[in-house]
Amino acid sequence: MVTVASLAALDGHIVFDDLQARRRYAPFRAYRQSKLADLILALELDRQARTHNWNLHSIAAHPGWAMTDISTSRLSSKQGLQERLTRLGAVWAFKLMGQSAAHGALPIEFAAMAPEARDGGYYGPDGRGERRGHVGEAFIPLPRATWGGAAAVAGGRASDRHVAIVVSR
C-alpha cells in the first residue's frame, strides 16, 4: 500500500481535540494536518503489519514541489489583489524550484513498484529541501518527543520501535 504524503506534512500539527477543524478552519492548515496524518497512518500500518505478520507492505512517498493543479487551482478573480499576488508568487516558486508533475510522480512510482523500496519507508526527491531531484529517502517530520503527548491524548502509549501512536483499548 502506498500512501501519498506531502512536504506540507513538515509544518503539519494534529489538533487531536478538533480533528475536523470545526472551531478554526483554514484550508492549508487542514491540508498540512491531513498529510501528516497520512504519513502517521502509513508508518503505523507498517508497524501493525510487522507485529501481526500480515502480508501487507506500507510505504509512503511525496512528490516534492510538483507543478500540478493544486499549486494553481486556487487562482481566482474573486480573490483580493494581495491573495492573488501571493498565489502567483507561489506558482513561480514552484516553476523555478520545483519539478514537473511527471517527475513528482517518480517517488510514488518507486514506492509502489521498486523492489528496493522498503516497508515503512518514506520516499521523495533527494534535492535541496526535497523539492526536486532523483528519488531518495525522505525526512520523516515526526519528532519522538511529540508522541508522548499525542499518545496520552489518544489514550495509549508511544511505541519505542517506530514514531507512531499505539492506542490501547
PLM-predicted stretches and their roles:
Residues 58, 66, 123-124, 140:
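Compositionally biased, intrinsically disordered low-complexity regions enriched in proline and serine
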Residues 22-29, 65, 71-103, 128, ...:
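Alpha-helical membrane-targeting segments
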Residues 1-78, 158-169:
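Rossmann-fold NAD(P)H-dependent dehydrogenase/reductase core
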Residues 18, 145-146:
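Short, solvent-exposed helix-helix connector turns and helix-capping sites enriched
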Residues 34, 87-139, 147-154, 158:
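C-terminal helical subdomain
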